[in-house]
Structure formats: structure tokens, C-alpha cells
Amino acid sequence: MPVITLPDGSQRSFDKPVSVYEVAASIGPGLAKATLGGRVNGQRVDAHDLISEDANLVIFTPKDDDGLEIIRHSCAHLLGHAIKQLYPDVKMAIGPTIDNGFYYDVDLEHKLTDEDIAALEARMLELAKTEYDVVKKKVSWQEAHAVFAARGESYKLEILERDIPQSDQPGLYHHEEYIDMCRGPHVPNMRFCLNFKLMRVSGAYWRGDSNNKMLQRIYGTAFADAKQLKAYLNLLEEAAKRDHRKLAKKFDLFHLQDEAPGMVFWHPKGWTLWQQIEQYMRAKQNDWGYQEVRTPLIMDRVLWEKSGHWENYRENMFTTESEKRDFAVKPMNCPGHVQIFNHGLRSHKDLPLRLAEFGSCHRNEASGALHGIMRVRGFVQDDAHIFCTEDQVVAEVAAFNQMLKSVYDDFGFTDIAVKLSLRPEKYAGSLETWNKAEEGLRTALRAAGLEWEELPGEGAFYGPKIEYQIKDALGRSWQCGTIQLDYVLPERLDAEYVADDNVRKRPVMLHRAILGSFERFLGILIEHYEGSFPVWLSPVQVVVANITDSQAEYVKRVEKALREQGIRVIADLRNEKIGFKIREHTIQRVPYLLVVGDKEVENQSLAVRTRDGKDLGVMPLDAFIAHLTADIARRGRVFSAE
């Protein structure tokens, strides 16, 4: 009879097969009441699934990430239950969980409106409040097929016929009269599904194939309690205020238009912001021993076939033909960098060789996936590749970690989550090489003082990788940086060097980026700072404004002096009231406003205000330049206006 081992190492013995719920009840009634499901020997199960042999058990409650996912998945079923009551002819497709929520794809002739969604949400709540039990039944493939055939659920039948072997026993979840098919697990009772919100409706092709019918995708979110739901909705409201597309219009940074989908038209202020970042990264890479290169935008398919991109990535590549030759616009820079490495015989004395490029790449993303400058078709990466020996990998990754931390600090991102993706089931190279590489990455992370989470099986087939996620002002995580070991591309493209024993060997190739896509990183910065960029990044750092025409010449002299110091400055000599000028430039989030009246002209001084409304008093030009220079040097760190 089963002996159940709990996460704290304690064990409980039972004289017959026992469910997760019953194990929880043996510990205490409070835990039993909160039990949603569990993990038995690594397998997720429902609360009432029986355990018939010795097992390790983790019990899921609403406090767990796994428990929250169960709640969200069950809310998708609740949505199915409700929409079937309101629209009996609807055909149900799929309803998975996603980040922060769930969706359900439905085939319904009636186009759902905001009013329909509100009514659907109300019916869902009405059903959940009845606190009915969710009953799971494992049935034969044939029985499941008969159930959905009788109900006219063509999409469920297709899933059965195409995706599920007839030897399987599908799980059917009964929500009173509504039946759905799922691997589960799901909540045992709908009292867990009271805190949800339907968010929006969009179109989605069945199976993501544009040749199939367009379905209606209903998105929702759900949480364990009302407080968490309210906090999340407030976060979304704040995120909407910070939407980089809205802020770009407000601050005149860039625009997008239908004639160039997924491509950005950068305006002067936005391009100034871009240039500050590029110049900063160029200097940083130079300090860390990188050599900047430039590779062609378009290259023959022969190279892409050798690299493997033509076979594995062709659908995402823009292609063209010229003089009976096929070409592709590069989706990434790595094959071009290998060509530079291969140009001439390399010695072990040349390694490590660090090649960097602000490479312009293009990927044929689906139009529905495009999102402002966060997801585009044309983008630039702070891409670099390090060619080194196996013995140099640890030192190179350790140095990269230090460089990455300093860059993120300068941009104001100090909360970094690190993920180490390890060997997948299918991999290239030897097990010994992989073990050495993985341990090398761990050593490099320790050397940088970074904590990390390990993701077994998540590495690419050609090598393990580290991903770096930064957290913004709203607590959202963004994956930007990465470093990837690659043992395969040097082999495919015949990269080699002469080792110290005069034997030709393959270099290890490290793919690395810190910002990732410039466009996406700029979008993150815009939303993170809500347009109030650190002074060193601000497109306009200072505005000098006169009160009357009599101060115009002095304002021009101040502007000239600041410009000569490399400061991005504008003189506002418009015939407007000073209060109007102050408000306008404050709204535009210009860091410093220098107000000049007759007294300032007489004393050769400046009245200094910040965009936050702080009055820094009157000071000479030299004193202000010293103050501003110190502020710029702080970069993304907290600034004290003293």
C-alpha cells in the first residue's frame, strides 16, 4: 500500500490507494479545503486522482504557481460552460492557459461585442457561485468520440482524430451539463474560480493556419483572490498609460504605418534617443575588447543552407531573386560573423576573438504578432560573437556577466533574473562536452555573484544558454540579454583555428546580446521611465526660456555655451507667457528648464527648475554645467537634485 513522501521529507502510509485530497485531509482540514491538485512523482494530477504506489507528492493550493495555473485553466472551462448556455450553437476549439490568464477559441457566427462579453462574464460568475463539483472521467477514445459527435463538436473531434492515439484514454471534465476534454488537472469545485475578468476578443485562425477558418478568441485573466485580481487590473491600467505607442506620439519619438508593417519611422527625438544608446554600447563594447564589424544585409541561399537557416527558418526569412540566384535578407548576424572569422587562417593566439555588430536584421513575423516597436519585422541587435577555445569559455562568460550587469545598472535596471537552460533530450556533441559547458556556465554565474534558475531540457540542441530578464517599474519581466554556447555552427560553416600543437580545431562560438533588439529595448525604456528618461538619454536635456524679448540675446549665448559642452539644448524664444513655456516643457519631460529674466541677465545667472517642479535656485552657468555633468554621469542611477 502506498507510502507518500512530502516535500519536507515526512512520510505518510495508507492501507489503500489514496487521492491527493485524502492525503491533504490527513494533514489537516485547512489544507484539504485548499487542495486543487498535486504533483505525483513529477506528474501533475487532479485532487481526486488515486495514488496506488509509493510516491513523492507535492500538494497544490491557490498560493502556488501550479495552483494558480489550475484555476486559470478551469476558468477557461467555465467560459466554455457559460458560452454554451448563452449560444448553444457555438463550437468549442481549444482553451489553454497563457501568461497571466487563459483564452478560449470558439466558432460562433455572431460577432461578440463588449456587451456580449460583459453578459458572458456575468453568466460565468453566476455559474461559479453555485459551487458545483467538477467531475473527471477517463474514457476510451471511442467513447470520447461518441460524446463529441453527439454534441456536434467538430473541433474536438478533429483533435481526437489527429492528435490523440486511439489507445489513449482522454479525460472528460463534466461541468454539470457541459463537457470538455483536457489533460488537466482542474479544480475539484468551482468555488475556486470566482476571481476572473474577461479582457478582450480577437481573431485567431484554427491551428494558427491562415488557410483555416478564423475563430473568435476570448481572453481572460484569473487569480486566487479578489485582491490579486484588482492589483493585476490596476497594473494593466497603469501599463496602458505607459504604452510606448501612446508615449511615442506624445513625445514625438517615432511612428509606424501600414505601408511598412513592422518597420519604424524614427523622428528626430526618437533617433537622438537611439543614437545615445548605440554610442553608449559602442564605447562599452570597445572597453571590453570587442571589435566592431559590418556584414551584408542580403546573402546567397547557399550560405543559409550551410548554416541550417534555410531548412529551419525559411518561413521567417524575406527572400528575393537576382540573376537566377536566390538570396535572403539576414534574420540574424551569426553566419556573417563566421565568414569574417574564416577570412584568413586563425591561430590560437588570436583567440578569444570578439566580433560585435549593430546588425540590421529582418524577420517575416506574422502581421497579427506585430506590436508597436516591441515586435517588429525590421530591427537592430547589439549582436556579438565570441570565438574561443573550450578552456576560455568560463572566463569569457564571466566577463560578459560583469559587462551585462554594468550596462543594466546604467540604464536603471538592477533586478535581474537569470535562467540557465540545460541539455535537451536531443543534442549535438558529446555528453562530456555538454557537462563541461554547463558547469562552466555555472562557474561563470557564481563569479559574477548572480543567482539563477536552472531549466533542464530547455537548451538549444547545439548548446546550453543563459537568459537574463530585467524587471521594469511595473514589475514586469523582459528577457533581453542572452549568451549561448554553440558547437554546431562552427562545424557547419567550417570555422577552425590552429591550436598550440599545430592541429586544426573548431572554435567554440558564443552568441551574446545585452539589449537584444534595439527597438524592443527602447520600447521597454519608454514604458519604464514613462518618457522621463535619465538626463544622459533624454533627447532634449535642457530648455532655456526667456520671459521677455529683452533676454533673448543672453538666452542665445547660454544655449551656445551649453551646446559647446555637448549638451542637447533648445532655446525657447517664443512670444508666450513663461508659465505656458514651463508647463509645456514639463509635460514633454525635459529634465531641466532654465528661466531667464532681467535679474538673471544682470547677474549673468540662471533660474534652474527640474521637470519634477523642484526649484534649484539661481546659479551661474558654470555651476549649472557642473551640476548637469554630474547628473549625466549618474546615468540610470537615482538622482538627487541637491
Swiss-Prot record:
The keyword DNA damage does not apply. Pfam families: HGTP_anticodon, TGS, tRNA-synt_2b, tRNA_SAD. It is found in: Cytoplasm. SUPFAM superfamilies: Class II aaRS ABD-related, Class II aaRS and biotin synthetases, TGS-like, ThrRS/AlaRS common domain. One of its GO terms (biological process) is threonyl-tRNA aminoacylation. It is an enzyme of class 6 (ligase). Its EC number is 6.1.1.3. This is Threonine--tRNA ligase. It comes from Cellvibrio japonicus (strain Ueda107). The gene is thrS. It catalyses: tRNA(Thr) + L-threonine + ATP = L-threonyl-tRNA(Thr) + AMP + diphosphate + H(+). PROSITE patterns: AA_TRNA_LIGASE_II, TGS. Catalyzes the attachment of threonine to tRNA(Thr) in a two-step reaction: L-threonine is first activated by ATP to form Thr-AMP and then transferred to the acceptor end of tRNA(Thr). Also edits incorrectly charged L-seryl-tRNA(Thr). GO terms for cellular component: cytosol.
